[in-house]
């Protein structure tokens, strides 16, 4: 059976919940609107589920004009995105970039929810990927994360309780590559005809404590890192999925055929 794109997910707010899509425009920075917003502390350092597990319960949606964020037990935040305003110097890991501050009302909403002082910023400018010669917004280092459905099935076959794909927060899920087939692929074409896109898979994704965080409740456990460590430790890190960079832009659609153009 040919490989097929089965899931598309965008994350408008870094470390917030994902939004499943049936189609998405692929830009140099990844899926349109992906990681366009981010929370930072007073020093400009990004906030994430690594230190604030409650961020898993945030449900953002963004249409290019309004960012709506829902969380259990609170009135939703409906925020009109600000294009111009104070520009803050911010940091994602060791990468310095800038974001437009989105104002006091949004900051207060998130601060009250997370019980920590923070500001909401919107990406502006340019930021290079960690490697591969691409661009990225507020994602950790790469604009896309690709995981095969069979890779998760392989992992779940080793776990006492299966886990959903959202633990790994991929952009693209592909069925038909085989378990860890994404590790063997270097370039893919997704779609057919003039609208087809191409991506280059450039680096295995190192996994962190976020994978142990239930994306519905924010509660943490020991899996999947405990099991992944037994068979997916590569280059002194636990790896699952492949970071990727767009090479040919266009529109992605769930159900698109996937062709591996080049292997490792």
Where are these regions (language model features)?
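Metal-cofactor-dependent catalytic cores
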Residues: 1-264
